[in-house]
């Protein structure tokens, strides 16, 4: 019901007042992904700063670690990454993005992933030359992210003869 009605303030209140992040990871993912798709990273990360429990869900844990890095809490983020690795965590794409953001790698990581909105955001954040052309199969979340981050082609610059590009923008 909460997701269907998309009342983000009510969802946030419900999750944080009851501290049920681990009992309802789907609702938490919906909330932070929606904020990120609107380019409201600060709001998404504020959710994690208010969570008192250890985050069990892998995706939410990755998001939390990224927020720590974004808030310059590198040591805390590194500790959580090390703990996750000891428990068998392995995600080469995610790790390479974080290594760049933490300054361990100096060469920008240019791979782009549309697997999740977090992966897509990390793709954008770690690539100074980021270019992405959405297609009909691009998720609505990514379209929203592209729009709110001003990453869509300027409509005036689109060739009027490029029917595919025009229809995908529509």
What kind of region is each of these model predictions?
Residues 8-11, 43-45, 74-80:
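Solenoid-repeat scaffolds in large eukaryotic assemblies
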Residues 15-23, 47-57, 82-90, 120-123, ...:
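Solenoid-like repeat scaffolds
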Residues 96-170:
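Long, internal scaffold/assembly segments composed of regular secondary structure
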């Amino acid at each position: 019901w909460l997701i269907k009605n998309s009342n983000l303030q009510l969802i946030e209140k419900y999750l944080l007042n009851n501290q049920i992040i681990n009992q309802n990871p789907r609702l938490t993912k919906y909330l932070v992904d929606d904020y990120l798709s609107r380019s409201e990273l600060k709001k998404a990360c504020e959710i994690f700063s208010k969570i008192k429990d250890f985050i069990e869900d892998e995706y939410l844990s990755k998001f939390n670690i990224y927020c720590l890095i974004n808030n310059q809490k590198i040591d805390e983020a590194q500790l959580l990454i090390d703990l996750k690795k000891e428990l068998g965590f392995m995600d080469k794409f995610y790790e390479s993005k974080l290594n760049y953001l933490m300054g361990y790698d100096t060469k920008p990581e240019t791979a782009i992933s549309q697997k999740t909105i977090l992966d897509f955001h990390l793709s954008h954040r770690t690539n100074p030359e980021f270019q992405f052309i959405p297609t009909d199969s691009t998720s609505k979340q990514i379209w929203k992210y592209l729009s709110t981050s001003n990453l869509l082609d300027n409509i005036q610059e689109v060739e009027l003869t490029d029917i595919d590009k025009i229809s995908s923008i529509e």
